[in-house]
């Protein structure tokens, strides 16, 4: 198992407070999202949590991802969604699954009274487009 905290300790103590630097963390081990990655991203300005990949980029996986990271890391410490697939024709479908997962999550937050529709619309744009642009430095 990867020990994210000890493994990145020296690096983050040197550059972790640099808000201009972006370090994106990806994992296939779902158990580390809530236990290590979300608290780390909530603390270190340079860190962003990468999107749920491989086995987790499914409707249920995306729901688990949001449940594990948002409470501690918030939305602004996420990297949105990017795609690494070699199956070029699946890219639109994968992004559609992400956007639908975002919409379901945000609708649930509205239903619980955590925020209103206008906040959800803003967060939907962030999660669908802006956070990925920011994480990868694609914003001029």
Positions of predicted regions on the chain:
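His/Asp/Glu-enriched short active-site or ligand-binding loop at hydrolase and phosphoryl-transfer sites
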Residues: 48-59
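Short flexible/disordered coil segments
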Residues: 36-41, 81-94, 112-117
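Short acidic/histidine-rich active-site segments
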Residues: 24-28, 50-52, 75-95
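Small/polar glycine-rich anion-binding or flexible loop at a beta-alpha turn
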Residues: 56, 83-87, 118-126
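Mid-to-C-terminal alpha-helical segments outside catalytic/metal-binding sites
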Residues: 76, 93-140
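Short, catalytically relevant binding-site loops at active-site mouths
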Residues: 29-33, 55-56
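Histidine/acidic residue-rich metal-binding segments in metalloenzymes
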Residues: 1-22, 32-47, 61-80, 98-107
